[in-house]
């Protein structure tokens, strides 16, 4: 048994179980499912190089559990924890898994270990989405809820919505202009056992007028494709309840900006449905370089004005300025379509 940590080993292990420190277990899935630390997350070492987006933010403390010989990159020296530290992750400690370790630490196995598949996530969603979800789920009248993420990226926000225990059964649809993003979204949902929550996913790009062009899974534009409306595109999604194809309980636009599309928000929402937006803004105080131009930044108060003027049934519940990790300001908007 080997134990390496920057702090007291008992403290670190107990902190993992209490949910105070994230824990990455890089052992083979079969070994993980036999026995692992409570609240740890399994990504086998050979898969990590394709799953960076599933790791926590680099500044967060991370505890690593591994077997002798586990490596992220076979040509590199060092353990997985050491290889992660080289890449900038904040490694609080690590150990080589062994049942003898609990004897060495005088810790009770039955309180710290569990078996079975992964039940946790290493990453966090957009913090402002996490903040408003209790309001959203309280305001939605159905337990079978539907969410559309426009500009979904790797799908982490959607995965977080579905993976936690909330009393709502969320079905998801995902759009992104990048084929790699949709591939990652698919891989993430597959790895978490959430494939049956996907109603639809598409590689599609929207122009300034709000019209869309579809692309194949290879990232090539569909042959003979013409620009189509959002409604026409969503009509092609699979696993969508008949007669309910265009309506969602929650629409997400996170680090995505299209004013024409924002004006269509009401047409996408069920009664009592919510729009959540978090994207870059000129707040009149902070100066930053990227992204540049009005195509990628709202003016302060602009987003709220657009959705309010588009339909009198849209009620703005939150209109605030927030900040992402590097200090750049973002517009935070939560709006609801009232009956």
From Swiss-Prot:
Query: What are its GO cellular component terms?
Result: cytosol; nucleus
Q: What are the transmembrane regions?
A: none
Q: Which SUPFAM superfamilies match?
A: Rhodanese/Cell cycle control phosphatase, S-adenosyl-L-methionine-dependent methyltransferases
Which CDD domains does its entry note? Answer: AdoMet_MTases
Q: Which GO terms describe its molecular function?
A: methyltransferase activity
Q: Which InterPro entries match?
A: Rhodanese-like_dom, Rhodanese-like_dom_sf, SAM-dependent_MTases_sf
All copies of domain Rhodanese, residue ranges:
17-111
Q: What is this protein called?
A: Uncharacterized protein UNK4.09
Organism annotation:
Schizosaccharomyces pombe (strain 972 / ATCC 24843)
């Amino acid at each position: 048994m080997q134990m390496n940590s920057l702090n007291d080993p008992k403290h670190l292990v107990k902190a993992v179980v209490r949910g105070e420190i994230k824990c990455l277990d890089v052992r083979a899935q079969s070994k993980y499912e036999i026995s692992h630390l409570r609240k740890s997350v399994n990504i086998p070492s050979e898969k990590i190089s394709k799953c960076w987006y599933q790791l926590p933010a680099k500044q967060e403390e991370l505890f690593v559990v591994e077997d002798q010989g586990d490596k992220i990159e076979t040509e590199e020296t060092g353990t997985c924890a050491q290889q992660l530290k080289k890449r900038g992750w904040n490694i609080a400690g690590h150990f080589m898994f062994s049942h003898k370790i609990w004897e060495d630490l005088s810790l009770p196995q039955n309180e710290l270990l569990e078996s079975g598949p992964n039940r946790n996530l290493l990453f966090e969603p957009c913090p402002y989405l996490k903040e408003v979800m209790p309001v959203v789920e309280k305001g939605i009248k159905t337990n079978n809820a539907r969410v559309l993420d426009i500009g979904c990226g790797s799908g982490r926000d959607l995965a977080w919505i579905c993976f936690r225990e909330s009393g709502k059964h969320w079905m998801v649809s995902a759009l992104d202009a990048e084929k790699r993003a949709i591939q990652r979204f698919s891989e993430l949902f597959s790895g978490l056992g959430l494939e049956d929550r996907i109603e639809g996913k598409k590689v599609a790009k929207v122009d300034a007028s709000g019209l869309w062009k579809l692309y194949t899974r290879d990232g090539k534009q569909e042959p003979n494709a013409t620009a189509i409306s959002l409604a026409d595109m969503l009509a092609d999604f699979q696993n969508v309840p008949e007669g309910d194809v265009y309506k969602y309980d929650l629409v997400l636009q996170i680090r995505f900006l299209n004013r024409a599309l924002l004006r269509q928000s009401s047409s996408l929402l069920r009664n009592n449905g919510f729009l959540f937006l978090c994207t870059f803004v000129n707040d009149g105080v902070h100066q930053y370089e990227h992204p540049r131009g009005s195509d990628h930044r709202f003016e302060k108060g602009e987003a709220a004005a657009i959705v309010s003027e588009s339909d009198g049934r849209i009620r703005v519940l939150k209109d605030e300025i927030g900040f992402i990790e590097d200090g750049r300001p973002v517009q935070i908007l939560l709006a609801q379509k009232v009956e």
